[in-house]
Amino acid sequence: MAADIRIARKNAGKVGLPEINLGVLAGTGGTARLTRLSGKAMALEMMVTGELMSFEDAHGCNLINHIWEGSAEDFRRDILDWCSQFTLPNKAVKAVGNIKRSCQTGPEIPFEYHLALERELQASLFNSTDAKEGIAAYVEKRVANFTGQ
């Protein structure tokens, strides 16, 4: 649940927090993350019953973004291919990092502070080489080639 984007391989497992069956709670962030991802009622039900759910059910509870079919080897290859869209030279990694920071920090602070954080993060990107490349590529109707600068 701590992953930014969660992708499962069809029929390769189940999702849940069964720690209650050991007489403990889902520590190390389990209760906090699950509550934020799926809402209080669903999180409570999952944690107090300790039941595991299919990836399809987990997808319906916003715990999994995508479910892909294929062998373990194909899945690994497909994941790496899919993730390449978020890395150099396809995306500006500083912008990706700032998006992650805003999305992770923002919900924990008042809305007006989240907007201020977003403005600060955006301002930090405008003078970057990658922002200049992205804007130039847009104007010139070509694909940007980001460098991480």
Language model: regions and residue ranges:
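C-terminal long alpha-helix characteristic of the crotonase
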Residues: A8-G13, F55, I64-A116, T129, ...
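Terminal peptide-recognition signature
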Residues: L34, A58, I99, Y138
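CoA-thioester-processing core
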Residues: M1-M47, D78-W82
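Short, basic/aromatic-enriched C-terminal tail that caps enzymatic domains
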Residues: G134-Q149
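Well-ordered beta-strand positions
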Residues: I5, E45, T49-E51, D57, ...
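Hydrophobic alpha-helical segments typical of transmembrane helices
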Residues: G30-R33, M42, A95-N98, E118-L121, ...
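C-terminal and late-domain segments of enzyme folds
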Residues: S124-L125
